[in-house]
């Protein structure tokens, strides 16, 4: 399905001839393809706001903060008004880069107070088959979210221990107010007093990061090397090595391999860590200690030599 970009496009390739031709006809509408690809590119969702709002909007004329607060209350113990507004801007493509804007259909318009369906999305919803496909995908997204996260409040940023994430997820989950694709490509990301450290344990031989060695020394302690530009005595380097003094939260994301069978792997969120030892500059070599130690299974997964 990843290669097909949406489930309906996948079906148009694998079903029997009669159904295949039905699906191919549905897939001839470029607006539909750009809309369903946007929705299914979000799966599995890590934040339920956008899908609950879209589900409501499919059968209503508009949605505002007050309505969103009410409908989200069915899915979350605690609803954040800031996250509602961030979700409106996200659906409005305010945080998309030019590539995303050209790839995906804009489904809503946001005037700062309420969101409404775009003419293009409204037109697609007049086709009952398209409407059914949108609703199925959105309902599936909400269902899998509830199975994974329940109604729990994970505070801000909205991160659940031992869940898998990619870098773009983090931009969304900390309400990052700029273009989200700028929030990737480096093993070190930050927003306000949250630092996000993305650690690959097994390096690809010819990658730039191959010279850095990260490893678990015990169930709660591991080595980490900073960005090559960071120093102990200033800026982010100083805040990193003395994170508790500077009230900086270090969020740890780890994956063993960058790719498995040519598929990029996500990172497992291990919660908070604190700096306990450090030396050198550009890069700084650190030992970090997790607040919650790894269980036996994860420790073995991360340290087993293959």
Residue locations for each model-derived region?
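Generic serine detector
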Residues: 4-6, 10-12, 21, 29, ...
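Accessory helical-bundle/CTD segments and flexible terminal tails appended to RecA-like ATPase motors
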Residues: 1-110
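Acidic, glycine-rich low-complexity segments with interspersed aromatic residues
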Residues: 17-20, 24-28, 32-54, 58, ...
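Compact mixed alphabeta submodule
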Residues: 259-306
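Serine/threonine-rich low-complexity intrinsically disordered regions
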Residues: 6, 16, 29, 64, ...
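Glutamate identity and glutamate-enriched acidic tracts
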Residues: 3, 9, 15-17, 22, ...
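Charge-dense, extended regions
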Residues: 78, 87-196, 201-203
